[in-house]
Amino acid sequence: MTKSELIERLAGQQSHIPAKVVEDAVKEMLEQMATTLASGDRIEIRGFGSFSLHYRAPRVGRNPKTGEKVELEGKYVPHFKPGKELRDRANIYG
């Protein structure tokens, strides 16, 4: 599901709320989540999961075109850990 599909689905379920308001709310929620992660804080949504930053250590990579070794710097990457309720719901299909 894409962001626009999510907005469309939510707007369809909440017909008393204008689609533009739903779109603005979704965009603001995602912006707040991104800002929180960028500041190094963790986000926990009980029953759904948590978002945090994980450190990826420096390593030696390869340029896929030339095969040349390239030094890659360490960096923080977003990480999502699903909550138990989400894992259980997903396992219905697995």
Swiss-Prot record:
It holds the Pfam family Bac_DNA_binding. This is Integration host factor subunit beta. GO terms for cellular component: chromosome; cytosol. GO terms for molecular function: DNA binding; structural constituent of chromatin. InterPro entries: Hist_DNA-bd, Histone-like_DNA-bd_CS, IHF-like_DNA-bd_dom_sf, IHF_beta. It comes from the Bacteria. The keyword Magnesium does not apply. Heterodimer of an alpha and a beta chain. GO terms for biological process: DNA recombination; regulation of DNA-templated transcription; regulation of translation. This protein is one of the two subunits of integration host factor, a specific DNA-binding protein that functions in genetic recombination as well as in transcriptional and translational control. The keyword Signal does not apply. PANTHER family: DNA-BINDING PROTEIN HU (PTHR33175), INTEGRATION HOST FACTOR SUBUNIT BETA (PTHR33175:SF5). Belongs to the bacterial histone-like protein family. Keywords: DNA recombination, DNA-binding, Transcription, Transcription regulation, Translation regulation.
